[in-house]
């Protein structure tokens, strides 16, 4: 093998795998062994040729001089033939060497081709992996940048402030009043409205006394549902002539109600003090509804011992006298006393719990009024009689 071939093989070894390198070395070793064998055969063939030429010369000396010329010619012919034979022998050896080198070259070319194919396949396999890795690395950046672009477009365009407000659960408060109380502006972004929805619900509860609960929920894409729960009306306050609703938390709503809008049966409070109204509502919260629904009017009737004494007139004409601060304790006992009452009675719960007939009280009141009238009539003539005497005394003086 020439130096050029060796240089080419060295360059190719860089691209071959470990197994291919070993196989290539094995082939080179084989080719070297074959070359050494051919060299030995050539060396062995040279002494044989010299021995044959010496034998022919000895036989030629024993013959006649005449035959020397012919033998010399024959020897010359033999030498030419031997040279030709040696050349013929060398030619197949060279052919064998060339064939072995050709085979090795073919094999190396095959291995080189296989190596190139393997390298190409590996390159093809590696290329998509590298591309995927770069894609995976760039994916977060692409996602974040695209989201930022979409958000900027959303806030710049009027789509960012579109809102559809839906109010449910309202009976006494209009939809416009509720939306106004939330303080949601039409220019507010949909996103900020979603983030501050709890604050808007608190604004609604603070601004409107009717609202007990408020909840704002979001429905994609632009709908906000305002669910409200209103306080129930417990009674009506009518101490000033106008009738105002009293809701279940004890607040007197400063919106007069027309008599035509009043229900058939309702609790009428004749209490001008709003603090006492709130206290009454708190006390009645522990009283059963069966008793509360039977109360027709509530009047403040203080006594010398109890300043917050109330008189509750029931729908069946019974009356209950009870202190405001003891309603939650004593008024529930009315359900036990009520079955024992056969006629309109007064149930006194100021000091204890006892009842007496209302007719007797009315009779006593009537008797007291008559006595007052009689006493007033008796005192009037005395005064008239005393008047002239006073006049005479003055004249005498």
Curated annotation (Swiss-Prot):
It is a single-pass type II membrane protein. The chain crosses the membrane at residues 139-159. One of its GO terms (biological process) is FtsZ-dependent cytokinesis. It is found in: Cell membrane. Its main location: membrane. Residues 74-103, 366-377 have a biased composition (Acidic residues). Residues 1-138 are cytoplasmic. Residues 24-115, 360-397 are annotated as: Disordered. Belongs to the FtsQ/DivIB family. DivIB subfamily. This is Cell division protein DivIB. It comes from Streptococcus gordonii (strain Challis / ATCC 35105 / BCRC 15272 / CH1 / DL1 / V288).
């Amino acid at each position: 093998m020439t130096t050029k071939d060796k240089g080419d093989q060295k360059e190719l070894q860089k691209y071959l795998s470990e197994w291919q390198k070993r196989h290539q070395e094995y082939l080179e070793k084989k080719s070297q062994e074959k070359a050494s064998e051919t060299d030995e055969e050539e060396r062995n063939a040279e002494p044989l040729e010299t021995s044959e030429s010496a034998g022919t010369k000895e036989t030629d000396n024993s013959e006649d001089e005449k035959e020397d010329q012919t033998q010399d010619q024959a020897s010359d012919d033999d030498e030419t033939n031997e040279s030709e034979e040696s050349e013929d022998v060398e030619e197949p050896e060279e052919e064998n060497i060339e064939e072995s080198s050709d085979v090795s070259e073919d094999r190396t070319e095959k291995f080189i081709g296989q190596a190139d194919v393997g390298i190409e396949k590996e390159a093809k396999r590696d290329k998509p992996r590298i591309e995927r890795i770069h894609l995976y690395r760039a994916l977060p950046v692409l996602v974040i940048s695209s989201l930022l672009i979409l958000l900027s477009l959303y806030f710049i365009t009027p789509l960012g402030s579109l809102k559809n407000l839906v109010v449910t659960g309202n009976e006494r408060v209009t939809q416009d009043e509720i939306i106004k109380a939330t303080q949601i502006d039409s220019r507010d972004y949909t996103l900020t409205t979603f983030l501050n929805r709890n604050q808007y619900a608190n604004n609604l509860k603070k601004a409107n006394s009717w609202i007990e609960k408020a909840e704002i929920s979001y429905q994609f894409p632009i709908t906000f549902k305002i669910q409200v729960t209103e306080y129930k009306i417990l009674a009506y306050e009518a101490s000033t002539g106008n009738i105002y609703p009293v809701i279940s938390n004890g607040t007197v709503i400063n919106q007069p109600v027309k008599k035509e809008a009043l229900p058939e049966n309702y609790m009428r409070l004749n209490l001008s003090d709003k603090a006492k109204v709130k206290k009454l509502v708190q006390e009645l919260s522990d009283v059963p509804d069966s008793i509360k629904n039977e109360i027709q009017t509530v009047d403040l009737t203080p006594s010398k011992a109890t300043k917050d004494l109330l008189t509750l007139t029931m729908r069946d004409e019974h009356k209950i006298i009870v202190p405001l601060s003891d309603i939650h304790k004593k008024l529930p006992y009315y359900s036990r006393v009520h079955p024992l009452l056969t006629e309109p009675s007064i149930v006194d719960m100021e000091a204890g719990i006892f009842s007496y007939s209302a007719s007797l009280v009315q009779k006593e009141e009537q008797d007291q009024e008559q006595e007052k009238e009689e006493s007033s009539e008796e005192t009037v003539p005395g005064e008239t009689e005393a008047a002239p005497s006073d006049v005479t005394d003055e004249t005498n003086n």
